[in-house]
Swiss-Prot record:
ATP binds at G623, P624, A625, G626, C627, G628, K629, T630. GO terms for biological process: DNA-templated transcription; proteolysis; viral RNA genome replication. InterPro entries: AAA+_ATPase (IPR003593), DNA/RNA_pol_sf (IPR043502), Helic/Pol/Pept_Calicivir-typ (IPR004004), Helicase_SF3_ssDNA/RNA_vir (IPR000605), Helicase_SF3_ssRNA_vir (IPR014759), P-loop_NTPase (IPR027417), Peptidase_C24 (IPR000317), Peptidase_S1_PA (IPR009003). Residues 597-753 form the SF3 helicase domain. It comes from Canine calicivirus (strain 48). PROSITE patterns: CV_3CL_PRO (PS51894), RDRP_SSRNA_POS (PS50507), SF3_HELICASE_2 (PS51218). GO terms for molecular function: ATP binding; ATP hydrolysis activity; cysteine-type endopeptidase activity; RNA binding; RNA helicase activity; RNA-directed RNA polymerase activity. This is Genome polyprotein. GO terms for cellular component: host cell endoplasmic reticulum membrane; membrane. It comes from the Viruses. Its EC number is 3.6.1.15, 2.7.7.48, 3.4.22.66.
Length: 1929
């Protein structure tokens, strides 16, 4: 609210207290404001609306504030509510409010009849205490407007007693702050004053005592959420006592409950009420809501981490519930606050925010006590056992192991294995995880069982000191008990709890009483601890219900997230209901669960309204009345579903009776005369959700959900064919004509008689049914598809059908509808396996009997069906098995096994005798896994309390549960890999609550994944027997009885079979199953010898360690061996010996072996001392020498230089024969790759397997969204060390989410082709997609050719286009036979991560485009017109001769007589070149030039260690430039000139862009177009040419400055000495350095300019320039975002449209001069390299070391040596082939030639000359002359008229500097300029005389040499020059 008040004085800078307001109010002379003061506070009285309005005016005037926006509406609403009542009482008009509030905003309360003025209280702002302060005048004004009580003596808020002081007359209204008064007949805040400190009442008849049964029963009702029997007075009375207890410690409520409990009581009541409307009746509900809203406003913008911390530390339930509300709101709207917030909050829900603070302390303390007990008590004779202890310790062996330890991976393996082997822990080390679980459990169990025994022993052993030391009345024990309370509950006890502790300890005067006291304390601590947990759950539920609001969760994603969090919270509450220690709070927990259930139900309903469904199948049974249509409808319904059908009646407007069953019957659906049934049917038979109209509250949101709809009608044509709704109606239904010939004949023959029953049959053979064709509205006609013929078209005759045909038709149509409908993810888990056994028709019965016998023998769960696939799988827990003939069509979702009838005849008795090995009897090849799946698959999870012995499966394992560890170990057999982790969690839960085993198992089964193996385990527990059977799903039986049952069937005797009857029937299994059994056997063998295997492996690693050993050769150990043994016993290998000898010989050193090894180690570790550097240089040369493969020898050379040792090659080097070139690339083409990935390195994340092995890669594209390949994700389990979620496959392409993405993201595009592979090399491809066979299956992609050899593990790396956007992913190569052939999977279109910032853009890829004057554009809806007019005026001195000037102001539009053309047309013409991208250099040539330029800059540019922060980056911008397309005006227009602070518009925009940039995500790259106001040559004006201005978005500019400001500054600092002259001072000594470089001996000079430079810049070159800048940055996400943004196509916004460029580089792009110059260098270098290589020259040196360049954007001077000079014509032709247009500097069409030494060089429109004063860069003379012709003034269309007012100061400075420049051209030209200057003095009013020629010459030279302050600014700073000394070109 603070931002809603505009202050004009300094009063807002200080806190404003109510006391100061009170003082000023008492001093006011306004008669309409009546004030009085008394002991309880300071009060206001408004006798009518005029007084209230006067008070508002006083606040405005006294504190100099102006309410507006939200603050004004808030204040005025409350004033209006007050005035409406006062108007009714006084009759005074309230029209004065209309100037503040619109009529639609006025909220008029309805006053109750008969109420007096004093009974109406305004719910308002409450203040209590003298120190109350307000942050803003808005809050103060609101408090004053609605009334307040200011307590000078900290008195309680309440009704004012009789006034003291000035009396108040009339029907005055006291606007006193009491938020709860409106909620009660007797306000508890007011009636609390009537309660005494002891709990009694001053008026016992009104308010009962605290101990009264009404108070107690009321509290119970609140906790049980059953408040229907409570009266309003009951609420008020309870709240009054609670308020008194919170303010007075002596109230008896504090003896029963603490203050935390009192607030907890209200929290529970509020959280337990399901409907928010019911909460208004709670005590102090309004104040509670106000408190939470206040916390929400204060904390909503705080970072998430701070909220988490506050949540864990806060003891304020209001603050905590407000924080939970904020967290739930942000997590629901995760797409606005990132998925990380949602995942963190889901985890936070599972935590208890008030856990025991001493969990680890307790574990450590108990562990210490256990060890101390072992040494002191359990070991009575430690001296006698000391030798045994030493022998067990084995200190000698341990010391040897430690001494031989090495701090390496291998060293740790050896050491740990040796220690484990030494102490016999090897098996323990192998099975470490289960042992840790067991030990931890035992330790924690011991800790919980010893608390009581320790206290008892302590009291027993020290009983003699009881009277003196254990006086429990001593305060020390209270403090000790309080400390224990803190350790147990996490909270220090308050007064009430301390009183309870004191009362308990006071009676502990004996040992027994002491033990009893300790037990009571333990129970109290446990209860208090649980109170905090329940309170924490209540605050979560309150926050959850506040988030369950359509204004908070506005879209389906937010609703889904809220439902997930509600389900998580419900699970947490559910676990507490299973905990016995929480049984006293069970009613409260159940109420909390009910509230969460209501939130879940509400979310589910909202999702159902937004979730697409499968369209139901609808038929209409038409025929005459009484023929049996309704009976037929119910018969069809019974065959379609086992459920009873739902019934709808369309004659009523509400459908509360609809039950949502699978079949719905609508009888006589068309009986409504208004034809409303048509729209109902169209909406019902649809994939969109259908919301039913229901009256009951609980049915609101009910949707139609039936699968099949059967309607009846007596009308042959329900909808006339001429109706506009006939086509959609008949397209959705199928009509079946039903007639009963027997009944009709009887009725005609026997009129008036009842139809006999024998005319009807149960199989409906009495009916004649004919199904019409699709779209038939009658028996012979169908709807015309185009609706032109009302009579329709001739249709096919009806098809005769029976009931079974109708049922099959409806089932088939529904399955087809499902195929067209994407089912929700997650339902696949309940998919039923289906097996089809196909045989000859005559053998179907035999196969059926064999399978039925096998099912009976082995108690299989599958359903067996013959000759049909129609089975209701919803009623079967197992798989579905079908036996069909080979003439039957088999559905695609069945596993097919074809039976061999010869095998059945060979062993027909096998299955009938035993029922086993049915595979041999059927002659099918079937794996054991399929057999297990078929027999024992369990669909879903089932819990059965009723146990029938004949239904129980046979046991595989029987486990007697002695501890939870036994349970966990047995459950391990049942679990899948992910389920094992859930088992560990179950162990912890069962440890915490071991007495609730059956209930906990039920809860645990809901979210557990079970193994695909069939396992049955019987658990014998103290409370009974549990039988668990699992196979994908699970069944569980629980009983309190003991069951004694035999063991089950082993694997060898199960349906998997084995060898029977002397191997007459061996099982026939696939080869894959045999391989699986072999690997299983190997694993079993290894498990038997795993200990020995580890020991042998460690021994091998130990033996491989470096050990001193003798390597002497020959018969003696002398010679070389003796030398090698020198050096302090160090032994060298042969290679090390040779290195030591060669190094000493070549460096002429006498280095010992020890010194040599030390030097080698220092060099290897990267030391930078002289010796290490020298050794690395020598080592590199030696390696290069040996890499040739030729022999070398050390020789001694004796010559003039003395004796020296050298290495000579002794073998002749032969030139290799060049292979014959062919189209097939050879192996040598792949040796240049260094394997370094260069494309979007920070956005590429690894995909790893379960054990951490590398599988491939994925690419992060922003907001946690990633793309990869299907075969990579199918193999890999983790992406960036986390599980991928929401995985979707589009062919081979996979896109998914990860919760913790990398810091950067890569841009993607769907409409381009790759030009570079992941390693930066060029790609050759036609980019035509097709299907290719690979080792990972068929893939749809394109073939690309690159010169990079790839290897397994490279799949998923990105290929990019010219702009660096990802267009495809690497999926495979041609292997060794064709390594250059790659398959690339294109990135197809899918929904990119949404973001509110990205939605704020003018060009949207998904939006439609239009053609606008030849450009493809999108409409923006915002017309940003191009600015008309010019600021240039003709000087008064040249009104008559301005035509003599070579330049004039640029074209002004269609009204300009010089060339009438609209400004929009000029913009369009300028954008034409941007429609097509220029070619640019070949990728491999550009890469080579890029690497050379980077190598050139490496020693010159320091690498930045960090990027600029947002504020620093903005400070580096020119604030006089445009803000871009989103914000109007210039940057300085949005900055406070005094404070420098940004306004809200600029701050919000930059913050939004910056938040994306910090994630590495590209931001919109858009520009506001304008036309440059400048002087142009008259020949340009004659053809309407005018240059564009690209106004860059300020957000893009800030991000670019943050990323590249330091690098660009470093480049500008070298402008005098390097290739880029941006920032150089052309009027200083730097030009002398340039001049020397120009005339380097042996070089040639070329001056070059370019036409249309900006629009012809190749995108791939710009991308490489940005990569070069990135190379010298910190490569942070902000840098990645800047590169991706500036590389993306720029968007031009103008005239209500936006245009997407395909090439070019906008002149307004950030760092445009630097980027243009880098582009210039890369283009020239690429052209030289390409031309030289085309001549057969291998450019293996850095080309930039041999040439010199001057570049500033498109201006260039090339200084080249002789060999480059010889090919310069081809270089310029090559530049033209790139799409550039190089020209001479004079813009003539002549070829570009070398500049002779006799001619001056022109650069930046200056000529380099040498005069008597030195080297000067002369400005063009015409540029100086035209300064006299034109003056800048106000914008005008009549530029030929002089300006009305001339800024003489600026004009004088401009012309003075012109004269200084003119002095450099000689006396004659200076005299000419002097004449112009004198004319200006005469006509323009300039007073300052021009300097003489000598004065001007001396001043310029002084400025040039730096003697005086220079006003001549360096090049590149045109923005300052235009503002000060203007030189218009």
């Amino acid at each position: 609210m603070a931002s809603a008040i505009a202050l004009s004085s300094s009063t807002a800078q200080n806190k404003i207290t109510l006391k100061s307001v009170a003082s000023r109010l008492q001093q006011t002379d306004d008669p309409d404001i009546r004030v009085w003061s008394q002991s309880v506070g300071f009060h206001l009285q408004f006798s009518n609306w005029k007084c209230a309005n006067a008070f508002c005016r006083f606040v405005t005037d006294a504190y100099n504030l102006t309410p507006y926006k939200e603050c004004a509406r808030s204040i005025t609403r409350q004033l209006t509510s007050l005035s409406n009542y006062l108007s009714a009482q006084t009759g005074v008009s309230v029209s004065g409010t209309q100037f503040l509030l619109s009529p639609s905003d006025v909220e008029v309360p309805v006053a109750k009849t008969g109420e007096s003025v004093s009974d109406i209280m305004v719910p308002s702002y409450s203040v209590n205490g003298t120190s109350m302060e307000f942050d803003s005048m808005a809050q103060l004004a609101q408090a004053l407007t609605t009334g307040f009580t200011f307590s000078v003596n900290d008195a309680q808020i309440g009704n004012a007693p009789a006034q003291t002081g000035e009396s108040v007359s009339g029907t005055g209204f006291i606007a006193e702050a009491c938020p709860s008064c409106a909620l009660y007949d007797k306000c508890p805040n007011c009636t609390s004053e009537l309660i005494n400190d002891d709990g009694s009442s001053q008026s016992p008849g009104d308010i009962p005592h605290w101990t009264h049964h009404k108070i107690a029963s009321g509290i119970v009702n609140i906790l049980s959420s059953d408040m229907s029997s409570m009266e309003d007075d009951d609420f008020a009375n309870i709240a009054a006592h609670v308020k008194k207890a919170l303010g007075t410690n002596s109230h008896p409520a504090n003896n029963d409950m603490s203050k935390d409990q009192l607030n907890w009581l209200l929290n529970i009541a509020e959280a337990s009420l399901i409907r928010k409307a019911d909460r208004t009746a709670l005590p102090m509900n309004a104040a509670r809501i106000a408190a939470r809203r206040g916390w929400r406003e204060k904390l909503f913008n705080e970072p998430a981490d701070k909220l988490y911390t506050l949540l864990r530390k806060s003891k304020d339930s209001f603050q905590k519930s407000a924080i939970w509300g904020i967290l739930f709101e942000k997590a629901s709207n995760a797409k606005h606050y990132t998925e990380i917030v949602f995942q963190d909050i889901v985890k936070l829900i599972k935590e208890e925010c008030n856990p025991s603070n001493n969990f680890y302390f307790k574990v450590m303390a108990q562990s210490f006590l256990d060890h101390f007990r072992m040494l002191v008590i359990d070991n009575p004779d430690p001296v006698a056992n000391l030798p045994k202890f030493i022998l067990k310790l084995k200190p000698l062996n341990l010391k040897m192991i430690i001494e031989n330890h090495e701090n390496t991976a291998e060293g740790w393996i050896v050491t740990l294995t040796a220690v484990a082997e030494l102490y016999g822990w090897l098996e323990f080390a192998v099975d470490l995880v289960p042992k840790i679980v067991s030990e931890l459990y035992d330790l924690l169990t011991s800790a919980t069982q010893k608390c009581f025994s320790m206290v008892r022993e302590l009291l027993t052993n020290l009983n003699i000191l009881k009277a003196e030391s254990f006086d429990f009345t001593n305060p020390f024990w209270y403090a000790l008990a309080a400390l224990l309370s803190y350790f147990v509950t996490g909270f220090l006890p308050n007064n009430a709890k301390c009183s309870a502790i004191k009362q308990t300890l006071n009676g502990a005067t004996t040992l027994v009483a002491g033990i009893t006291a300790i037990q009571k304390l333990a129970a109290m601590f446990s209860a208090w601890s649980n109170e905090s947990v329940v309170d924490d759950l209540s605050t979560k539920v309150i926050g959850l219900t506040e988030a369950d609001n359509p204004t908070v969760t506005q879209d389906i994603d937010a609703v889904t997230n809220l439902q997930i969090m509600a389900e998580q919270l419900k699970d947490q509450i559910k676990l507490k209901t299973l905990d016995p220690t929480f049984q006293p709070y069970l009613p409260v927990l159940r109420n909390l669960m009910s509230t969460t259930d209501s939130v879940i139900s509400h979310c589910a309903k909202r999702k159902a309204l937004a979730t697409q469904r499968t369209a139901p199948v609808c038929i209409i049974l038409t025929g005459p009345a009484g023929c049996g249509k309704t009976t037929l409808a119910y018969a069809i319904a019974n065959r379609l579903s086992a459920q009873k059908p739902s019934v709808l009646n369309l004659n009523i407007d509400h459908h509360d009776a609809y039950t949502g069953n699978e079949v719905c019957i609508i009888d006589e659906f068309d009986s409504n005369p208004d034809s409303k049934f048509v729209e109902f049917v169209v909406e019902m038979v649809n994939t969109n959700p259908m919301l039913l109209n229901c009256d009951l509250i609980e049915n609101k949101g009910k949707t139609f959900s039936s699968k099949y709809v059967i309607m009846t009608s007596n009308n042959e044509t329900p909808v006339k064919p001429n109706s506009t709704r006939a086509p959609p109606f008949y397209r959705r239904v199928r009509i079946i004509d039903v007639t009963n010939p027997g009944v009709m004949s009887f009725k005609y023959e026997n009129p008036g008689q009842e139809v006999p029953s024998y005319l009807f049959s149960n199989d409906f053979n009495h009916l004649s049914m004919s199904m019409r064709g699709f779209g038939a509205f009658s028996k012979t006609r169908v709807i015309d598809p185009e609706g032109r013929k009302t009579c329709g078209l001739e249709g096919p005759p009806g098809q005769r059908v029976d009931v079974d045909d109708i049922v099959r038709y409806m089932q088939r149509m529904y399955r087809e509808n499902q195929m067209n409908f994407k089912s929700e993810a997650g339902n696949n888990r309940l998919k039923t396996p289906r097996f089809a056994f196909v045989t000859q028709r005559k053998h179907v019965d035999t196969v059926y009997k064999i399978l039925a016998a096998a099912k009976t023998t082995y108690n299989g769960y599958y359903s067996l069906t013959k000759d049909s696939f129609d089975v209701n799988e919803g009623h079967n827990i197992g798989s579905s098995v079908f036996v069909v003939g080979d003439d039957k069509e088999i559905p695609h979702n069945c596993k097919i096994f074809r039976c061999n009838h010869l095998a059945m005849f060979r062993h027909p008795e096998l299955a009938h005798i035993e029922g086993d090995n049915f595979r041999a009897a059927l002659g099918v090849t079937m794996s054991d896994q399929d057999v297990t799946l078929m027999f024992y698959h369990i669909r879903g999870k089932h819990i059965q309390d009723e146990v029938r012995l004949d239904e129980l499966p046979a046991n595989h394992h029987i486990v007697t549960v002695h501890s939870v560890y036994d349970m966990a170990w047995a459950l391990n057999r049942h679990l899948s890999l992910t389920g094992k982790w859930q088992a560990l969690k179950a162990v912890y839960d069962l440890y915490m609550t071991p007495d609730i085993l059956p209930a906990a198992l039920r809860h645990w089964m809901d979210n557990t994944k079970f193994s695909s193996d069939h396992v049955v385990t019987q658990f014998i527990v103290p409370g009974g027997t549990i039988i668990l059977e699992t196979c994908n799903g699970a069944r569980m039986w629980a009983t309190s009885r003991r069951l004694i049952r035999a063991g089950g069937i082993s694997n060898n005797n199960g349906p998997e079979g084995g060898f029977r009857f002397g191997s007459i029937a061996p099982r026939d299994i696939p080869w894959s199953e045999i391989l699986r059994e072999f690997l299983n056997l190997i694993s079993l063998i290894w498990s038997r010898v795993k200990g020995a295997t580890i020991v042998l492996t460690a021994l091998l690693l130990y033996m491989k360690r470096y050990k001193p050993r003798s390597e002497a050769k020959g018969k003696t150990k002398g010679g070389r061996g003796a030398i090698r043994h020198g050096g302090k016993g160090i032994v060298l290998s042969d290679d090390e010996y040779d290195e030591w000898r060669e190094f000493n010989m070549e460096k002429r050193m006498d280095m010992s072996v020890d010194e040599f090894l030390m030097l080698k180690h220092r060099a290897a570790l990267g030391s930078d001392d002289t010796g290490a550097i020298q050794f690395r240089s020598w080592w590199t040369a030696r390696q290069m020498r040996e890499s040739t493969g030729l022999d070398h020898d050390d020789v001694t050379v004796i010559g003039k230089g003395g004796v020296r040792h050298e290495v000579h090659r002794t073998e002749i080097m032969k030139a290799p024969k060049q292979k014959k070139k062919s189209f097939a690339w050879g192996e040598d083409m792949y040796a240049e790759g260094d394997g370094k990935i260069v494309n979007h390195v920070n956005a590429i994340v690894p995909v790893t397997g379960l054990c951490g092995e590398h599988i491939g890669y994925a690419v992060h594209i922003g907001h946690g969204k990633c793309i990869s390949l299907k075969h990579v994700l199918k193999t890999g389990s983790y992406v960036f060390n986390q599980k991928p979620i929401d995985v979707t496959f589009d062919g081979e392409l996979a896109h998914f989410q990860i919760q913790q993405p990398p810091s950067s993201a890569a841009p993607v595009t769907f409409s381009s082709k790759p030009t570079r592979d992941p390693w930066g090399r060029s790609v050759s491809t036609e980019w035509k997609h097709d299907t290719y066979n690979t080792t990972a299956g068929k893939m749809y992609g394109s073939i690309c050719w690159t010169a990079t050899r790839t290897q397994p593990g490279d799949c998923g790396l990105p290929y990019v286009d010219r702009a660096g956007q990802v267009v495809g992913l690497h999926a495979g190569s041609g292997g060794d036979s064709a390594p250059g052939r790659k398959i690339v999977i294109p990135v197809t279109k899918f929904k990119l991560p949404s973001n509110t910032v990205l939605s704020n853009r003018f060009w949207k890829e998904e939006a439609p485009t239009i053609s606008y004057k030849g450009l493809t554009v999108q409409e923006t809806g915002v017309n940003k017109a191009v600015l008309k007019g010019t600021n240039y005026h003709v000087s008064p001195a040249h009104v008559d001769d301005y035509q003599d000037c070579t330049h004039q102001p640029a074209n002004l539009g269609a009204q300009d007589e010089r060339y009438p053309v609209s400004l929009t047309s000029i913009v369009i013409n300028n954008l034409e070149p941007y429609k097509q991208p220029t070619q640019g250099p070949p990728t491999e040539v550009l890469n080579k030039a890029y690497n050379m330029l980077v190598q050139h800059y490496e020693p010159l540019i320091p690498k930045a260690t960090t990027h600029l922060e947002m504020g620093d980056a903005f400070a580096a911008l020119n604030v006089k430039t445009s803000c871009g397309p989103y914000i109007t005006g210039r940057k300085k227009d949005h900055i406070d000139p005094e404070t420098g602070k940004w306004d809200e518009t600029l701050r919000n925009h930059i913050n939004a862009r910056w938040s994306l940039a910090t994630q590495g995500v590209p931001i919109p790259h858009e520009y506001q177009l304008g036309l440059k106001d400048e002087l142009r040559p008259k020949d340009k004006i004659a053809v309407g040419k005018r240059r564009l201005i690209w106004g860059c978005d300020v957000g893009v500019a800030v991000v670019a400055a943050s990323a590249f400001k330091e690098v660009s500054s470093a480049i500008m600092a070298m402008s005098e000495f390097d290739f880029i002259q941006v920032g150089i001072n052309m009027d200083g000594t730097a030009v002398e350095t340039l001049y020397k470089r120009l005339y380097t001996p042996g070089t040639h000079r070329y001056c070059v300019d370019y036409s249309k430079w900006d629009s012809t810049q190749p995108p791939n070159v710009t991308r490489m320039s940005l990569e070069l800048l990135r190379h010298f940055t910190d490569k942070s996400p902000v840098v990645d975002s800047a590169v991706a943004t500036l590389s993306s196509p720029s968007i031009a916004v103008f005239g209500g449209v936006s245009f997407k460029t395909n090439g070019g580089l906008p002149s307004g792009m950030p760092l445009t001069s630097i980027l243009n110059s880098l582009n210039h260098c890369l283009l020239v270098g690429s052209a030289i390299i390409q031309v030289l290589e085309s001549k057969g020259v291998d450019v293996n040196w850095n080309i930039y070391d041999t040439i010199d360049l001057f570049t500033y954007g498109d201006d260039g001077v090339y200084i080249v040596p002789n060999f480059v000079h010889s090919v310069m014509p081809e270089v310029f032709s090559c530049l033209s082939s790139y799409g550039l247009k190089p020209t001479r500097t004079d813009k003539s069409s002549a070829p570009i030639t070398e500049i002779p030494l006799s001619e001056p060089i022109e650069f930046l429109k200056r000529q380099f000359v040498r005069n008597q004063f030195g080297v000067r860069a002369l400005l063009d003379r015409s540029s100086l002359i035209r300064q006299f012709y034109y003056i800048k003034g106000k914008n005008t269309m009549e530029w030929t008229k002089p300006p009305e007012q001339i800024d003489l100061t600026s004009r004088t400075a401009q012309l003075q500097v012109v004269m200084l420049y003119a002095s450099q051209h000689g006396r004659e030209f200076y005299k000419k300029c002097l004449d112009y200057y004198q004319l200006a003095m005469e006509y323009e009013g300039i007073k300052l005389d021009a300097p003489t020629y000598d004065e001007a010459l001396a001043k310029y030279n002084a400025n040039f040499n730096g003697v005086e302050d220079c006003d001549l600014l360096p090049a590149g700073y045109d923005e300052h020059r235009l503002d000060k000394i203007v030189f218009e070109n």
